[in-house]
Amino acid sequence: MAKNTAIGIDLGTTYSCVGVFQHGKVEIIANDQGNRTTPSYVAFTDTERLIGDAAKNQVALNPQNTVFDAKRLIGRKFGDAVVQSDMKHWPFQVVNDGDKPKVQVNYKGESRSFFPEEISSMVLTKMKEIAEAYLGHPVTNAVITVPAYFNDSQRQATKDAGVIAGLNVLRIINEPTAAAIAYGLDRTGKGERNVLIFDLGGGTFDVSILTIDDGIFEVKATAGDTHLGGEDFDNRLVSHFVEEFKRKHKKDISQNKRAVRRLRTACERAKRTLSSSTQASLEIDSLFEGIDFYTSITRARFEELCSDLFRGTLEPVEKALRDAKMDKAQIHDLVLVGGSTRIPKVQKLLQDFFNGRDLNKSINPDEAVAYGAAVQAAILMGDKSENVQDLLLLDVAPLSLGLETAGGVMTALIKRNSTIPTKQTQTFTTYSDNQPGVLIQVYEGERAMTRDNNLLGRFELSGIPPAPRGVPQIEVTFDIDANGILNVTATDKSTGKANKITITNDKGRLSKEEIERMVQEAERYKAEDEVQRDRVAAKNALESYAFNMKSAVEDEGLKGKLSEADKKKVLDKCQEVISWLDSNTLADKEEFVHKREELERVCSPIISGLYQGAGAPGAGGFGAQAPKGASGSGPTIEEVD
């Protein structure tokens, strides 16, 4: 396989997944724990940084410094209502840095703060490493997916996270579109089909309607909620049980981060159980002040707790149908994507909405997005496999884009659901006589007045020659690239003077310098992680050597071949090292290596003398090279004859 392989990464709110297209098919790659999805968690401890399963597994012990949900922060402002409401549920601290949210944690004994892009970049680095371990060579090219309903700043911030992780982001593509590729790739030649992708994940919800016809995937409309998913169902369960605990035990656990985290983990498990059983039990020992919490919940009660959220998933479905100008009967396939679509009630609501139509569950809801991203990555790298070479993706802009005209009116140049890439030009003029310049303010959203929409950026076109109002002609061009990221240019026709802006949300966007700095920091963290790995390996090697020596001299088979004095010398030294290890677990690699050499100086002559004297190599399971047998990194095992 050529070294210029590109990977597809589904960077999820709660879990991420990576795939690669090679030899004509997609492989979803398992991580070092054998899991095909990896938690989007990053944990900081006194000694190290953990990413993925390792981070999620220790979350109850370290809730304040374990960061997740970075996708719910990325590209948003600190003052956003959703950020403020999420902060109530998060055990980690979110601080305000010039209206940008930053996550504050304790790492190696000092307080550190990170932008959401940095946290996401750590997860991306992990996914990149998972792919590299599988492929056996470095990987830099990647396609990363985002919810279709992500706005410009969220897309741009996700792209920045990729850059910080050392990736060359070939393209940002929409999750439902990627899932549609996974669905439609093997279904060519069936004529034109209208497909509705219903994608309900851990933190985001998208609905997209596509027409798939012989390798052409054309998105007709998209709708969704970038803040609805499995986490919100977990939150409802957590609140329910916090109240139940209050009723039963007259105690409020909501301020105890560790108790709430243990409860949340149990709720997540119960929620999954309720997709296949009608009842789930929670058993948490010593949840709070020594009180054991044993309780249960029925599926009906869970559905009742989340009923408004579940019903709310149908609004975007209706909106997408309206925008695509289709009615229910015109949809051929209803495809479920995202782990939360396993919830029976969600399936039933969708099925009833489409008058009892069967839902298509043929693709893996956890892996479909990464699968499609991997296919798109291969196409962008020029893969010539027959099943992808004719594939064409036509995606859309999720929100209308325009600028503010006199009186604060929103004038849209690009309507929502326009196929991208696209370019629209319109001519504007001045509002007052001899106006020397115009302020171009770019907004996204569907409301009539700009104050109700989202300001993406603003720039000035100055130096307009004096003229009566309405005479100067200013040509404004909106150009959206294939990533859904916008460039705006304004030109004064009389002077040819132009000014342009890549909408990079001056307020929300990281500057080039910041990104550079973060790239270097990411490298540094990676180096620190490696030092930590080497340190642990040296510690394990010392520990296993000490125990091996101890068991070697205690071996019954050596009675009479080893003087008591020598035996005592080895045992005392081993015991000394083992005690030293217990009280110096955080020593440097060099100290472990030094201790080991010290131990070898005592043991080697005795052990090798023993085997030469005994003339019986291999006695007690050690070859003549016994001391070196344990010198690999990490614990080693000896074979016993």
Curated annotation (Swiss-Prot):
Compartments in which it is found: Cytoplasm; Nucleus; Cytoplasm, Cytoskeleton, Microtubule organizing center, Centrosome; Secreted
A GO MF label: transcription corepressor activity
Omega-N-methylarginine sites (modified residues): R469
Signal peptide segment: none
Assembly notes: Component of the CatSper complex. Identified in a IGF2BP1-dependent mRNP granule complex containing untranslated mRNAs. Interacts with CHCHD3, DNAJC7, IRAK1BP1, PPP5C and TSC2. Interacts with TERT; the interaction occurs in the absence of the RNA component, TERC, and dissociates once the TERT complex has formed. Interacts with METTL21A. Interacts with DNAAF2. Interacts with TRIM5 (via B30.2/SPRY domain). Interacts with PRKN. Interacts with FOXP3. Interacts with NOD2; the interaction enhances NOD2 stability. Interacts with DNAJC9 (via J domain).
GO cellular component terms, semicolon-separated: centrosome; cytoplasm; extracellular region; mitochondrion; nuclear speck; nucleus; perinuclear region of cytoplasm
Its job: Molecular chaperone implicated in a wide variety of cellular processes, including protection of the proteome from stress, folding and transport of newly synthesized polypeptides, activation of proteolysis of misfolded proteins and the formation and dissociation of protein complexes. Plays a pivotal role in the protein quality control system, ensuring the correct folding of proteins, the re-folding of misfolded proteins and controlling the targeting of proteins for subsequent degradation. This is achieved through cycles of ATP binding, ATP hydrolysis and ADP release, mediated by co-chaperones.
Native source organism of the sequence: Mus musculus (Mouse)
Comment on protein domains: The N-terminal nucleotide binding domain (NBD) (also known as the ATPase domain) is responsible for binding and hydrolyzing ATP. The C-terminal substrate-binding domain (SBD) (also known as peptide-binding domain) binds to the client/substrate proteins. The two domains are allosterically coupled so that, when ATP is bound to the NBD, the SBD binds relatively weakly to clients. When ADP is bound in the NBD, a conformational change enhances the affinity of the SBD for client proteins.
PROSITE patterns associated with the record: HSP70_1 (PS00297), HSP70_2 (PS00329), HSP70_3 (PS01036)
Positions carrying Phosphothreonine: T636
Primary gene name: Hspa1a
N6,N6,N6-trimethyllysine: residues carrying this PTM: K561
Protein keywords: Acetylation, ATP-binding, Chaperone, Cytoplasm, Cytoskeleton, Methylation, Nucleotide-binding, Nucleus, Phosphoprotein, Secreted, Stress response
Binding site for ATP: 12-15, 71, 202-204, 268-275, 339-342
Modified residues (N-acetylalanine): A2
Post-translational events: In response to cellular stress, acetylated at Lys-77 by NA110 and then gradually deacetylated by HDAC4 at later stages. Acetylation enhances its chaperone activity and also determines whether it will function as a chaperone for protein refolding or degradation by controlling its binding to co-chaperones HOPX and STUB1. The acetylated form and the non-acetylated form bind to HOPX and STUB1 respectively. Acetylation also protects cells against various types of cellular stress.
Chain spans, region Disordered: 618-641
Keyword Transcription regulation: no
One GO-annotated biological process of the protein: mRNA catabolic process
Region (Nucleotide-binding domain (NBD)): 2-386
UniProt region (Substrate-binding domain (SBD)), positions on chain: 394-509
Primary localization class, coarse: cytoplasm
Modification N6,N6-dimethyllysine occurs at: K561
Stretches that traverse the bilayer: none
Record protein name field: Heat shock 70 kDa protein 1A
